Amino acid sequence: MLPSPNGSTIAFALADSGAQVVGACLRNAGAVARWLAPKVADGASVVVVPAGERWYDDTLRPAVEDLWGAGAVLSALVAELESAAGASPEARMAVAAWGAVALPEDLLNAASGIELADAGFIADVEIAAQHDVSEVVPVLVGESFRDAAALPPPGPRLRRVGS
């Protein structure tokens, strides 16, 4: 698969802020949603960032496929939680965009898909267009993503009471 420099930059910036970072895409949207659901049910907040890319002049280039990926994860999360309560307008629009997409055709005809196909990466685009074919939930640990299933369970969250 092809790397996402902008996605990597965002992932590391979020991790540096103390957030737990999970890699999600069309291929693992359901698995990520199932992993997130109990955390959200326990009160955790979720931020889904459709990273986009950068133009050659370093300005942001939105990527519709990242919006679809965000919508796929959020749609699956809503289904897991059986509620869209608290979803932002942006989250609801991502879910709507996901509901409107026709894969793989739309991805192959999107600007990024055409660009990658023209560069000889059509097989990568076709793989990226697959939905819910992976159960891997990649969690950023240090400088690499690791499968959440292979990580030790988190310890209890302790806080100091009094002095």
What annotation goes with each model-predicted range?
Residues 5, 14-20, 61-163:
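Long, charged alpha-helical interface segments
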